[in-house]
């Protein structure tokens, strides 16, 4: 290391512009700038700094004033530090980072990343550089690696030169500005930020970006190294202004605590009278120990708010900057000497040691003469000038009484240093142990988060299943109502059918009675026909004329009135008209009977088709019920698997509790060992009470720190226990819900059995309806035979009518000659006619009754058809709903499978990322040569670029 030189900490003061909230609030702009180094707040005293940057200063101007020179110093072998200090929302992160990829608004860190490589490319080609970067944050007084989030509580150790460093922090080798920016982007994405009343993106941690540059001259083998700390501090907060609460309030407490420790270190260094500087009060001051009063060129950028609302905080920040400006650092070049240089330095120190020994010998001689009472003349006394000119003497060394005392003090000092070193070593071991425990706790926490995610997904699946079950229950109830309506309609139809069948049987019996009566009448008519045949034999000469009259009567019955001319004939004609009307009514009755029989046949066909559709729909309903039962069994299997999974989780929880108990036992053992060390240390303290006061203070600080770590560990364990109890409560709730689902499933099974029984009853009723349908077919055949019989009888009646008309015509013409015979014949004919009229009247009444019944049936038929159509539509709707439910179930099953695959992939990727910490390849950089385009290897090119060799370094 080169000879040290003193330098002061540079302090730059930057004021940001008023933000929108301050402008809307009407805050006053209070700073007044006097030159480039002085600022006055209100009517107060002036504050002088190395540079004052007003609000209109650009990011490039800030960089040129604050950081450009430090980059050159680091490349020359010095250590450098730049950190921003100020209250929250004062612009620290904007100053240090800005917008990372905006050429105009990027801050100090991205500009340094580009400027370092620009300087390297312009330097001597014989220089070879190795650059590695680290990025970590101090969150809740714990060091957290931003490039590997699994490292959450790293320890601070000291190297052989007593320089603090973060042990276990991830280091990335870089060879271009783009790689540095990638590292910054990766780390910034993992940094803690939050929203407060004063800042939408408030940093909740102190971030430190470390650039370690090693350079070697390949010709002279001269090696230089430099470190550059780029620190973005979290701002001090006043809770009444930020409105912090909950976790944000805890973060604010830790931020203010660490900033208070930084202020104490600055104050101790500024006063210069204190023998102890409290670097170990916080991890941030411990890391920045070299930057504050050590071997480092340090620049502090104090960021201030110009608003009168923050006047008190601004003045406090300015006072901090003035105190820091008085601190002196001792800087030297970090030079690694070669073997030849070490040899020269050794010879030089050896000669210097010889000269000092000779001076000591002369001084001891002079001291002995004084002690023996001899007065040493002034010319024989050794002055400061003579000490430099004295040569080493070869006389026999004089035994001095002071030498043993000096040796004893040196031995005690060495012993004291060894004890302090052992205490520091123990502290480092404790830090390592705490780091391991923290990583274990973080892994457990990550496992808990994974389990929470799985539990949440399980809960979502359960809710979906519950919704599906509810929907199926609603559809089941609706289907029950539909089935009840259909059954009711079928029952009504069956009752109506029974009534109509009974009526048809009654009408059939009436028709049989009428048939018997007609048979009797036929016999009577036969006798009458024989009599008429006898009369016909008597009137053959009138046969031709009677035939013509009969043809005329068949064409038009109205012509009978034109043939008959007398009053008697007119009366007979009226009687004949009545008979003709009754025959016509009989024909109409028969035709209506035909139409009714046809309508009954059509209706029977419709009922058969409706019955077929009902059977088909019932089969579809059975298939739907079977599918629903299959879905319920699948859900039962899924619930059973979830229950097994919850039992596995319970076993894991017990294992975690056992591991926790074992850790508690180990902690108790460590405490016992600590007490034993305390007892031994107290024994030593009695012997060296006056000399070990500083060691006692260090021990107290160590105990306090261990107590704080112990309390934090206990809190974390209690929090994990609470989380485990909460998970157990959730598992109990899921178990209860599972039991409810089982009860619901049993209820659905009972409903299904009831539906099955009802379905069987409906099948029995359908069989009865089929039997009734067969009876109806038989009745239809009987009606058909009856129709043929009636038609034959009507034909017979028609023939009788013809004969009767002929007889009447004959009797009208022979009325004068056969008066007495006609009187008797007329009485007999009148009796026959009245008998026929009575029969026709009865037939007419029967016909009218059948017409009314037919009309009633036709009125009832549209209602039944409408109800049947509604039932068919509902069955179609149920079929479509069932189809849609099946499709939704398939989609949900696919979505669930995709979600499970995604979670598995995420866990697998996370595990791969945790295992992916393999060795890295260092990337040497040569000035004058830009980085190669290949991402796999970087070529170190010698001067002139004629040859290249791929150089790799293992981390």
Swiss-Prot record:
The Kinesin motor domain is annotated at: 8-327
Provide the primary localization.
cytoplasm
What GO cellular-component annotations does this UniProt entry give? Answer: axon cytoplasm; axonal growth cone; ciliary rootlet; cytoplasm; dendrite; dendrite cytoplasm; distal axon; GABA-ergic synapse
Q: Which Pfam families match?
A: Kinesin
Q: Name one GO molecular function term.
A: microtubule binding
The Swiss-Prot or TrEMBL record describes its family as follows: Belongs to the TRAFAC class myosin-kinesin ATPase superfamily. Kinesin family. Kinesin subfamily.
Q: What is this protein called?
A: Kinesin heavy chain isoform 5C
Q: Which organism is it from?
A: Rattus norvegicus
The lineage, from the top, is:
Eukaryota, Metazoa, Chordata, Craniata, Vertebrata
Which gene is this protein's source? Answer: Kif5c
């Amino acid at each position: 290391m080169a000879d040290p030189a003193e330098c002061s900490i540079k302090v730059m003061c930057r004021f940001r512009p008023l933000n929108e909230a301050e402008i809307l609030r009407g805050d006053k702009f209070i700073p007044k700038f006097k030159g480039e180094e002085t600022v006055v707040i209100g009517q107060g005293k002036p504050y002088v700094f190395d540079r004052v940057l007003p609000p209109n200063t650009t990011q490039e101007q800030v960089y040129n004033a604050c950081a450009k020179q430090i980059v050159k110093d680091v490349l020359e072998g010095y250590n450098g530090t730049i950190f921003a200090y100020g209250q929250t929302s004062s612009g620290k992160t904007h100053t240090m980072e800005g917008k990372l990829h905006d050429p105009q608004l990027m801050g100090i860190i991205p500009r340094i990343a580009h400027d370092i490589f620009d300087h390297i490319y312009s330097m001597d080609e014989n220089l070879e550089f190795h650059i590695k970067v680290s990025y970590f944050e101090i969150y809740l007084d714990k060091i957290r690696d931003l490039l590997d989030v699994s490292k959450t509580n790293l320890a601070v150790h000291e190297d052989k030169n007593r320089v603090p460093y973060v042990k276990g922090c991830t280091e990335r080798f870089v060879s271009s500005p783009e790689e540095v920016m990638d590292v910054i982007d990766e780390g910034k994405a993992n940094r803690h930020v939050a929203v407060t009343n004063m800042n939408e993106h408030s940093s909740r941690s102190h971030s430190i970006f470390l650039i370690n540059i090693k350079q070697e001259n390949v010709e002279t083998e001269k090696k230089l190294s430099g470190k550059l700390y780029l620190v973005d501090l979290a701002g001090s907060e006043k809770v009444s202004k930020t409105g912090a609460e909950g976790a944000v309030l805890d973060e604010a407490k830790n931020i203010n605590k660490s900033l208070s420790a930084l202020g104490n270190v600055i104050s101790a260094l500024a006063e210069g009278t204190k023998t102890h500087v409290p670097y170990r009060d916080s991890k941030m001051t411990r890391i920045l120990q070299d930057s504050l009063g050590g071997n480092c060129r340090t620049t502090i950028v104090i960021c201030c708010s110009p608003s009168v609302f923050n006047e008190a905080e601004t003045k406090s920040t300015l006072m901090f900057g003035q105190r820091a400006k008085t601190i002196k650092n001792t800087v030297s070049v970090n030079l690694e000497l070669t073997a030849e240089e070490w040899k020269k330095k050794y010879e030089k120190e050896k000669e210097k040691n010889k000269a000092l020994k000779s001076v000591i010998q002369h001084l001891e001689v002079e001291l002995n003469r004084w002690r023996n009472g001899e007065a040493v003349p002034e010319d024989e006394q050794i002055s400061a000038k003579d000490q430099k000119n004295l040569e080493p003497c070869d006389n026999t060394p004089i035994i001095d009484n002071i030498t043993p005392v000096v040796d004893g003090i040196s031995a005690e000092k060495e012993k004291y240093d060894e004890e302090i070193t052992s205490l520091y070593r123990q502290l480092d071991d404790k830090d390592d142990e705490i780091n391991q425990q923290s990583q274990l706790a973080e892994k457990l926490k990550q496992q808990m988060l994974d389990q929470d995610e799985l539990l949440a997904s399980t809960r979502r699946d359960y809710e979906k299943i519950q919704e599906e079950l509810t929907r199926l229950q609603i559809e089941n109830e609706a289907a029950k109502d539909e089935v009840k309506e259909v059954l009711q309609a079928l029952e009504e139809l069956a009752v109506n059918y029974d009534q109509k069948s009974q009526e048809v049987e009654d009408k059939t019996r009436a028709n049989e009675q009428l048939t018997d009566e007609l048979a009797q009448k036929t016999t009577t008519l036969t006798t009458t026909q024989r009599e008429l045949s006898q009369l016909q034999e008597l009137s053959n000469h009138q046969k031709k004329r009677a035939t013509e009259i009969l043809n005329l009567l068949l064409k038009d019955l109205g012509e009978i009135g034109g043939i008959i001319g007398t009053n008697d004939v007119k009366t007979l004609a009226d009687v004949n008209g009545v008979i003709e009307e009754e025959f016509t009514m009989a024909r109409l009755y028969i035709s209506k009977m035909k139409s009714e029989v046809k309508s009954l046949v059509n209706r029977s066909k419709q009922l058969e088709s409706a019955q077929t559709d009902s059977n088909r729909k019932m089969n579809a309903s059975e298939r739907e019920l079977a599918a629903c039962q299959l879905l319920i069994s699948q859900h039962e299997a899924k619930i059973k698997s979830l229950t097994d999974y919850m039992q596995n989780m319970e076993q894991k929880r017990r294992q975690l509790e056992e591991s926790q108990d074992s850790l508690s036992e180990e902690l108790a053992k460590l405490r016992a060992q600590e007490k034993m060390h305390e007892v031994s240390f107290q024994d030593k303290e009695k012997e060296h009470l006056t000399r070990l006061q500083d060691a006692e203070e260090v021990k107290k600080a160590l105990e306090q720190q261990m107590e704080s770590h112990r309390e934090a560990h206990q809190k974390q364990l209690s929090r994990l226990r609470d989380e485990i109890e909460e998970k157990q409560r959730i598992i109990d709730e899921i178990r209860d819900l599972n039991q409810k689902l089982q009860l619901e499933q049993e209820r659905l099974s009972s409903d299904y059995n009831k539906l099955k029984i009802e379905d069987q009853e409906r099948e029995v009723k359908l069989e009865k309806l089929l039997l009734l349908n067969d009876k109806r077919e038989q009745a239809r055949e009987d009606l058909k035979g009856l129709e043929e019989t009636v038609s034959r009888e009507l034909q017979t009646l028609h023939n009788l009518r013809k004969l009767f008309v002929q007889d009447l015509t004959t009797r009208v013409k022979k009325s004068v000659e056969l008066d007495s015979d006609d009187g008797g014949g007329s009485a007999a004919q009148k009796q026959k006619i009245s008998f026929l009229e009575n029969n026709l009247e009865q037939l007419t009444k029967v016909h009218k009754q059948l017409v009314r019944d037919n009309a009633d049936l036709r009125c009832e038929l549209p209602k039944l058809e409408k109800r049947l159509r509604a039932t068919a539509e509902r069955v179609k709707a149920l079929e479509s709903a069932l189809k849609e439910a099946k499709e939704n179930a398939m989609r949900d099953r696919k979505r669930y499978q995709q979600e499970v695959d995604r979670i598995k992939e995420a866990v697998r990727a996370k595990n791969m990322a945790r295992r992916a910490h393999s060795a890295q390849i260092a990337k040497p950089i040569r000035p004058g040569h830009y980085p190669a385009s290949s991402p796999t290897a970087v070529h170190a090119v010698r001067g002139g670029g004629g040859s290249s060799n791929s150089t790799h370094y293992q981390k």
